[in-house]
Amino acid sequence: MTDPLIHTRKVMGFVRDPLPTTGALSLKSTNARADLEWLGWRNVESIPLMWALSGAGDPDVALNQLVRMYQTLESQSPQAREELDQRIRADEAFRVRLLALLGGSSAMGDHLVANTHLWELLTEEAPTRAEMFTAMLESVGATPAEVVPVDDEGEERQVANTATEDLTTPGTYRATLTGVDAERALRFTYRTLMMRLAALDLAGTYPNDARRRSQPRVEFTTVTRRLSNLADAALTAALAVAVTGVYGQKPVDARLSVMAMGKCGAQELNYISDVDVIFIAEPAHSRSTRLAAEFIRTGCSSFFEVDAALRPEGKSGALVRTLESHIAYYKRWAETWEFQALLKARPMTGDMDLGQAYLDAIGPMVWTASQRDSFVDDIQAMRRRVLENVPEELRDRELKLGRGGLRDVEFAVQLLQMVHGRYDETLRVRSTVEALQVLVDQGYIGREDGHNLIESYEFLRLLEHRLQLERVKRTHTMPKVEDRMNMRWLARASGFTGSGGQSSARAMEHHLRRVRLQIQSLHSQLFYRPLLNSVVNLSVDAMKLSQEAAKLQLGALGYQHPVRAYEHLTALASGTSRKAKIQAMLLPTLMEWLSQTADPDAGLLNYRKLSDAAYDRSWFLRMLRDEGVVGQRLMRILGTSPYTSELIIATPDFVSELGDGTTGPKLLETAPDRVCKALKATVARHDDPDRAIQAARSLRRQELARVASADLLNLLTVQEVCHSLSLVWDAVLDAALEAEIRAATADPAKPDEPLAAISVIGMGRLGGAELGYGSDADVMFVAEPAPGVDENEAIAWAISVCESMRSRLAKPSGDPPLEVDLGLRPEGRSGAVVRTIESYENYYAKWGETWEVQALLRASWVAGDRELGTRFLETIDKFRYPAGGASDAQIREVRRMKARVDNERLPRGADRNTHTKLGRGALADIEWTVQLLTMLHAHEHPELHNTSTLEVLEVVEEKGIINPLQAQTLREAWLTATAARNALVLVKGKRADQLPPPGRHLAQVAGAAGWDPDEYQEYLDHYLKVTRKSRQVVEEVFWGLDSVEARREL
């Protein structure tokens, strides 16, 4: 006889159990089968129930909680268990709500298990706002309170109280229960109402397939509005308890209005969230302050954190203020972020009329905040602080504050509201989703973009809600990817199912990744694409900003000159040409990248100039369209460095070098020495010296563009930049000298062979191969007569060649200048331009001063006749590296000269703390210190016969002449000051040594130095810290331990 509980059928000789296995039901627990049998569900009649169970977020948790409920009910009476079981079988909607709740929220399941009689509430629809008010207020026996405020003269005034006898509205009530009893009643009622809302919400993301059916999905805005209504009701009851605690049965002698802020104010509250509030009291005396404080304490003890930190002056400000005091504060003292917070303000409970008066008075100020001078800087600083508060390791898991997170959407939407809401009152709405919809409807953002963002935002909020519901705790952090169990639960509770070999968790991960990427691109979608649509030809029904709205938006996005910026956009993207259409497609993304630079105005202008310069190059726009990295790099350069921008605009073909090759950035594929060889070879093909110098300029321009671009993109170190700049100068000098010699010997009226060999000796930074962008070429010329040529005739010929080269290089052009400076030669500017080795030797032996000998420490051959240059260097070694080292008199003289430099050379009005060359602990301090150490120890250590500051520092550290910490301090300061000096040239387009004060110009320098432009204050602090430490080492090493006494002796 067949077992009636297990029907079987024979299939090809095998017996198949028609009941699903626990594995098929997604049950992992070893007790699952036994639990199902205990419930009476392990039978054919219960198959729908088992499949329903398998749809829960965590079926094992749901099963465990269900068993506990049955056990509790059975302990009460068999009939109680049977009633629940029959309702589960008969009522599909209830079944889904119950199982979705038990498998989606452990905390809510625990509440239901502890109070099993509440299960019948899950058969009902969602409580209305009025019903929630009634439930919360009835839980503490509330009735409308008598509010009779007393003014400063002691006069009583009757005011309207929106509290009602049927307990369905916000207002000022008085509770019967107080203390612990009240808190217990409030907590229970609040948790029960939340449980009902959660069950309906979770049932809406329950999986729907052939084996089970979900319930209607509850719209996100409906969920958040219900939760906000619940918070309103809960805090209205908390205020009733506070009234009794402060006043007892006496009339309330103050009007107290509670303004909801943040998500609660916008009626888009989470399940578990702080509720931000602001209090207005009339009068604001000690009792109204006590009432507000008791309200906060009761709310925090019973429901959630109630936070009044958004009030004027924050936590240090008065807890309650009069309306007049609020108005005065917002008119005079409020910061931009405080007006941004007021976007969400809403009268919540207490005196609703006073709350509305607050909104009427303060609200208009919100819509003028975007006109404040500091608005853009404030907005950027607020966003930066948000990101800084998220640890790097959590930025991809944080739903709220991380990359592509909720705050990105909220921040962007609020910015658009504040910019355009001044003139467009339809934007004066509180909730993010409603604001996004209005932005779409009014044409501020594209319809598709806007709707995609709404969906993305609501999806992130859904995940946030599910995470919070699980333990009823405030959280915004996703589980780690490797936490498969929690990822699986979250995915299932959020409505994801596995398919095609992909698990539900994987499906959720992929969708989340897409959403984050979409949100990360929202600045292009929300801010820049509408701007472009305002200047291109569109159909009348297409989304399009007005010209005035577009200019307003440009100003809010950081453009200092929005009218000009709009003109640039019009010039670039208007018209019907193919190029204009491509520009209109590209510019939203390009402008997003420009917005991350220190000077987007200049960047947009430079892009317009470059587009004009590259007009006949068909590949230009195509490359920007197809190779995103080219556009991104180009915008960083154009918005950061006028110096580099001009180089690129003059050589548009260079843009192709900003892409990637097979081994990485193309900018790094070209070795500096190969560039120099190519430069010399190209110049050598020209007999005309003017054309030769023109060719040298052109190739130098390309190399400067390459080095500066790589520098701005953080692809080269400071040493690599300086070395590359030095090599190209060497090549220009060598090629130019050869060109002049060719020209001199080609003249029929002059000798056809050179009358002298000429060598160019690099001095200063050129000699040390440490040139910056703004450095001149300090040189000396050495000549040697050709065999059989009179010395005077040879020197005169060499002088004419060298002077001709200098003047030809110095001719004005659109390129960075090519100044050759002879100021370090013997006798300075009054000395001979060219000398023989013997003449130099005689001069240094008889008349050479200490400063001239010190200058020789950096002398090296850079161009011309190498053999002659080598002999010259060997000759001067006895002067710069004397056998016994520098004399005491020379050391005293060096220190005396340095003291004069410190006291006299700093330009009038310069800041000694931030002057990169002559400032405290800056380049001059470090280089003089290194040169003094060379003079003292080079006779003992041949490794110090080196012209490079950094390489000498390495040697003095290795030899123990200074300790490693001192060497590292000087090294870091030299690199920092050199990078800052280079950045100044990149930003100003000419040589500069003084860092600007904090502000926009310093932000530009910080950006060029590799820092985030918004972090210009941190950049300045770093510079000051590094140079301060450097100065301390200079005091110890250059001046001696007793530096004050050392200088006094001078």
Curated annotation (Swiss-Prot):
Q: Name one Pfam family in it.
A: GlnD_UR_UTase
Output one GO BP term.
regulation of glutamine family amino acid metabolic process
Q: Mind telling me which SUPFAM superfamilies this protein's record contains?
A: Nucleotidyltransferase, Nucleotidyltransferase substrate binding subunit/domain
Q: Where is this region: Adenylyl removase?
A: 1-531
Q: What is its EC number?
A: 2.7.7.89, 2.7.7.42
One of the entry's Gene Ontology molecular-function terms is: ATP binding
Q: Where is this region: Adenylyl transferase?
A: 537-1050
Query: What is its EC class?
Result: transferase
GO terms for cellular component: cytosol
Nucleotide-binding as a keyword of this entry, yes or no, is yes
Q: What does this protein do?
A: Involved in the regulation of glutamine synthetase GlnA, a key enzyme in the process to assimilate ammonia. When cellular nitrogen levels are high, the C-terminal adenylyl transferase (AT) inactivates GlnA by covalent transfer of an adenylyl group from ATP to specific tyrosine residue of GlnA, thus reducing its activity. Conversely, when nitrogen levels are low, the N-terminal adenylyl removase (AR) activates GlnA by removing the adenylyl group by phosphorolysis, increasing its activity.
State the HAMAP family in the record: GlnE
Family to which the UniProt record says this protein belongs: Belongs to the GlnE family.
Q: What is this protein called?
A: Bifunctional glutamine synthetase adenylyltransferase/adenylyl-removing enzyme
* Species of provenance: Corynebacterium efficiens (strain DSM 44549 / YS-314 / AJ 12310 / JCM 11189 / NBRC 100395)
